A protein has these predicted regions:
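Conserved hydrophobic helix-helix packing surfaces used for dimerization/oligomerization
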Residues: 146-148, 169, 291, 440
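Phosphate-coordination loops involved in phosphoryl transfer and adenosine-cofactor binding
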Residues: 142-145, 213, 287-290, 356, ...
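Local cysteine-cluster metal-coordination motifs and their immediate loop/turn environment
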Residues: 44-66, 89-110
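A conserved FAD-binding loop/helix module that cradles the flavin
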Residues: 300-305, 443-471
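Feature captures the FAD/FMN-dependent oxidoreductase FAD-binding
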Residues: 140-141, 145-149, 197-246, 360-375, ...
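Beta1-alpha1 glycine-rich phosphate/pyrophosphate-binding loop at the start
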Residues: 5-32, 61-73, 78-83, 87, ...
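FAD-site-proximal beta/loop scaffold in flavoenzymes
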Residues: 250-288, 381-450
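A short, basic/flexible loop-to-alpha-helix module at the beginning of a structural domain
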Residues: 30-31, 35, 127-146, 265-289
Length: 486
């Protein structure tokens, strides 16, 4: 590495978050700029560790030591080339990936790990600023047509890879804007949407076609795809939310996280014609309300940060699992993803966070509005036995359910295509990402279940390679004119 003793001399640093009182007044990303000199210093902490275990934690197999060293030496343009060799969208992972690579960093065995996520974001943002990221259209078209259903990170990664390989690619998105969960599920304070838009401009210039308001299996018949395309990739995500089936669930004021978060993202986009904007009874807002968020994961934290910015009266976040340890648990030794307490920016902003809480029932008023949540403290998993005498009640006006996702929505497209499902309810695939129907492939959360943005990109790239092999197995295409898919 460029500085053999960097990990001994330089401490881990991260960008500071903007002051809570400032960032709660807007929807912009929460981190302050990080000076270039410090970015390079963080790259110097990457050790000459022999076997870089950071690779084992990275689903896209990023060449992490390579671009850490290039960043340290100020070779930013070379760094973005190495970064793009494995990751189509480092600006997404550099913002919303939890960085399992850092959990697997060798330095992290007994010191704070290398700031890999920070360096990744620094490299790609420098590349955008300098104009080093540009369209890469194919030199030759294959004449093959591919439909991609879903425009989240898996669908976008596959679409870009397939187009660069010379195939004609059309992406179908049920919403009115491209981006999937990144567009409508991730709050702006974590991912401002211009970050998505600039990458879409590159993809359009490469020749990818996007069709919005196209819900395949609902307002677009599946035959429109099966009759027209040589291959179809399903990348519609795992959108079926886990419900809380307790008495009182039918009361007004109880909503899934993915009903709440998209509304605010649409407000941030400046939408004017949504039903919830013209009819206040359809709006899900936390302003002046006593809010409870059920679920302690990333989606719950997104609901928490969004709630804070809407000025609630109070907010509680409850999780049925016990409080994680402050440091890596013995049950998840290095280089595994550690079980440990994580504090997001949203938690820093306020609210009460509590663990080992099970919800028993909701009660409401005479108008059918939720007014109370009855809970009990429980013991450890797997039994979660209620602790006698620990029952308590909380007054509430708004409840947000953020308890994860059960898999893809089966009705509509999946049922109409007659696709087989696995034992978890996800779309089943054989070797090479092909489903039970010839020529139809699946990738991302639709195939593997609820997961991370970095896994989605990995799935999209691998599915693209499988589709490319399927389409060109017997095709007369000169290989020297085609971009290899890896």
């Amino acid at each position: 590495m460029g500085k053999d003793t960097g990990f001994l001399e330089i401490q881990r640093e991260q960008p500071t978050r903007r002051k809570v009182e400032d960032r709660l007044q807007d929807w912009f990303e929460i981190y302050e700029p990080f000076p270039e000199e410090k970015q390079r210093e963080q790259g110097a902490r990457c050790m000459d560790c022999g076997v870089p275990f950071c690779h084992t934690g990275c689903p896209v197999n990023n060449l992490i030591p390579d671009w850490n060293d290039l960043a340290y030496n100020g070779r930013w343009e070379a760094a973005i080339r190495r970064l793009h060799a494995t990751n189509n969208f480092p600006e997404f992972t550099g913002r919303i990936c939890p960085a399992p690579c850092e959990a697997a960093c060798v330095l992290g065995i007994d010191q704070p790990p290398v700031s890999i996520k920070l360096i990744e974001r620094s490299v790609v943002e420098r590349a955008w600023e300098e104009g080093w990221i540009h369209p890469e259209p194919p030199e030759q078209n294959t004449g093959k047509r591919v439909a991609v259903v879903g425009s989240g990170p898996a669908g976008l990664a596959a679409a870009q890879q397939l187009r660069r390989a010379g195939h004609s690619v059309t992406v179908y998105e049920k919403n009115d804007r491209i981006g999937g969960l990144m567009r409508y599920g991730i709050p702006n304070f974590k991912l401002e949407k211009h970050v998505i838009d600039r990458r879409l401009e590159q993809m359009r210039a490469e020749g990818v076609t996007f069709v919005t308001n196209a819900h395949v299996g609902v307002n677009v018949p599946v035959e429109a795809l099966t009759d027209h395309y040589d291959a179809i990739l399903l990348a519609g995500g795992a959108e079926q939310p886990r419900d809380l089936k307790i008495p009182g669930r039918e009361l007004k004021g109880i909503h899934y996280a993915m009903e709440f978060l998209p509304q605010q993202n649409r407000r941030c986009e400046g939408d004017k014609d949504e039903d919830f904007l013209s009819d206040p009874s359809l709006a899900i807002l936390a302003e002046g309300k006593r809010v409870v968020i059920i679920g302690g994961g990333d989606t719950g934290a997104d609901c928490l940060g969004t709630t804070h910015r809407q000025k609630p009266l109070s907010v509680h976040q409850f999780e049925i699992m016990p409080t994680p340890p402050a440091q890596r648990a013995a049950s998840t030794p290095w280089p595994m993803w550690p079980l440990q307490l994580r504090t997001e920016g949203a938690h820093e902003e306020g609210g009460i966070r509590d663990w080992s809480i099970n919800s028993l029932r909701f009660t409401g008023d005479e108008n059918g509005n939720v007014k109370q949540l009855h809970m009990v403290r429980v013991g450890p998993p797997p039994s979660f036995e209620p602790i006698p005498g620990s029952e308590f009640t909380l007054d509430v006006d708004l409840v947000l359910l953020a308890m994860g996702f059960l898999g893809p929505v089966r009705s509509g497209m999946i049922e109409q295509l007659g696709l087989a499902l696995d034992n978890r309810g996800n779309v089943a695939t054989k070797d090479g990402y092909m489903t039970s129907v010839e020529g139809i492939f699946a990738a991302g959360d639709m195939r593997r279940g609820q997961s991370l943005v970095v896994w989605a990109i990995s799935e999209g790239r691998k599915a693209a390679a499988a589709i490319d092999s399927y389409l060109t197995a017997n095709a007369d295409v000169e290989p020297q004119f085609r971009r290899a898919l890896v």
